[in-house]
Amino acid sequence: MFDNALLSLSHEQQQQAVEKIQVLMQRGMSSGEAIALVAKELREAHDNEKINSEKTKSAEK
């Protein structure tokens, strides 16, 4: 699922994302591709975290 919502990232998470983008670019990926890939990974991680949180809440009922 593609979600255009802005994610709220801590400073540390932002730094990690920047570093990953830089590594991908050093390996030859364009900046646009690197940013898109890291953003996709962040969205997927956020979605998985949200799903796990909802499962936990359901189990507590």
From Swiss-Prot:
UniProt cross-references to Pfam families, sorted A to Z: UPF0181 (PF03701)
Entry similarity comment: Belongs to the UPF0181 family.
Protein name as catalogued: UPF0181 protein MS1074
